[in-house]
């Protein structure tokens, strides 16, 4: 009787701070005016990983979303709301688990330690064959370096974009060190601008009317 092949395991880790900023951009400032679809994102990740999967193995994705704020269910200052509940349901529908930090995060000085520690744990116990990380932040560059040293491929989903806000031009860029340590970098802003990739949006994209007047900008990092 032939030996059953172990599945090819994908660890999909989502930096909630990055996704929050990216979602805000696509909903309110991008021409398509829509949030990102988690089902579309999951399918996209599976397609990107498939070429690396041996033909005799099946693909299994384990998804983790790391929220940038404490769980409001245990925080009297920030009561749980229905929009967050719906957000969690969207994640769970795609097999993605929500993680909240135990303490408030300062995104200007550090990344999400739970995200970092979980990737290290999965890598240490060899529970994943490939990592897909959605993030633009340099706080995770050392984690990407660690994966390279352990010969675990990292596919990085990142964004570079700019948009006007309050007479300023907001810039959002993927950290260069994080990008360089990745086995493969995918410029998601280019993917999502492709008219054939509308499945990555919750709603059918509709174009926003662009302002006809000229504006002067001051530059500000997002």
Residue spans for each PLM region:
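Domain-level signal for Mg2+-assisted phosphodiester chemistry and nucleotide/NA-binding surfaces
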Residues: 1-109, 160
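Nuclease catalytic cores that cleave nucleic-acid phosphodiester bonds
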Residues: 82-221
